[in-house]
Amino acid sequence: MALTIARTETQLAATTAFQAMDNLMASTVSSSFVVPANVSKLVSVDVGITADGAEECAALLRFAGNGLADGEQYTVCSSIVNAGSATGTSNNYVSKDTDFNVISGNSIECSIAVTDATTISAAVVMTFA
């Protein structure tokens, strides 16, 4: 059975420093979460990201914490490119199959950073099995 955990950020002043994703839509949640019981892998990561106006960036997700058996793991998000005639930009979401070993009952934090300081909104769904 697969289980999912989601995190979002809206209008985040993203930088090259990783920032914890500590929202779930309108709700503020813990920046870390407990790996669900009876799972051993983070099997996929789905992420959608958008930037304001003519901003552009490439984004990276970091998964860190004692819930990762093999240490920190990373996945890349879609890159955002300048769309001069638009009032915002968006790209297709990324669906990434992963094979990250996890430890049930321990914690993981999902954080995001970008190559160029940019105001972004992002949504991430992590699937465990």
Language-model region placement:
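C-terminal interaction-tip segments
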Residues: 1-23, 28-36, 52, 113-129
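Residues that act as N-cap/strand-start positions at coil-to-secondary-structure junctions
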Residues: 27-29, 43, 92-94
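Beta-strand-rich interaction surfaces with strong enrichment in secreted/lumenal proteins
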Residues: 31-33, 96-100
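Extended extracellular/luminal ectodomain segments enriched in beta-structured repeat modules
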Residues: 36-44, 105
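Short beta-strand/loop motifs in extracellular/secreted proteins, especially
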Residues: 41-43, 55-59, 118-122
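Short edge beta-strand/loop segments characteristic of extracellular beta-sandwich folds
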Residues: 46-50
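Terminal beta-strand-rich extracellular "head" domains
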Residues: 54-98
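Noncatalytic modules at the cell exterior or secretory-pathway interfaces
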Residues: 99-116
